[in-house]
Amino acid sequence: MFTINAEVRKEQGKGASRRLRAANKFPAIIYGGSEAPIAIELDHDQVMNMQAKAEFYSEVLTLVVDGKEVKVKAQAVQRHAYKPKLTHIDFVRA
């Protein structure tokens, strides 16, 4: 099983997302279930290594958001058009 460390995003919008990507992070969101959606930021290199395995897309993942574990599945993954970079991931609560 995969465990990914995440932080709640303090800023949102295009400029904030670009600053995240320049800092080797990228935005993501957790939604679904009865709880409200959570905008998070992830470390690019950590997730890039994990997503190379097929299990990343089919198994339940554990996101540690501010010390609290959230069980999720990767719903949608957006990649850069020509660079080997992730730009956004949607996670749905499992």
Swiss-Prot record:
It comes from Salmonella typhimurium (strain LT2 / SGSC1412 / ATCC 700720). Belongs to the bacterial ribosomal protein bL25 family. The gene is rplY. GO terms for molecular function: 5S rRNA binding; structural constituent of ribosome. PANTHER family: RIBOSOMAL PROTEIN L25/GLN-TRNA SYNTHETASE, ANTI-CODON-BINDING DOMAIN-CONTAINING PROTEIN (PTHR33284), RIBOSOMAL PROTEIN L25_GLN-TRNA SYNTHETASE, ANTI-CODON-BINDING DOMAIN-CONTAINING PROTEIN (PTHR33284:SF1). This is Large ribosomal subunit protein bL25. Part of the 50S ribosomal subunit; part of the 5S rRNA/L5/L18/L25 subcomplex. Contacts the 5S rRNA. Binds to the 5S rRNA independently of L5 and L18. GO terms for biological process: translation. This is one of the proteins that binds to the 5S RNA in the ribosome where it forms part of the central protuberance. InterPro entries: Rbsml_bL25/Gln-tRNA_synth_N, Ribosomal_bL25/Gln-tRNA_synth, Ribosomal_bL25_short, Ribosomal_L25_dom, Ribosomal_uL5_bac-type.
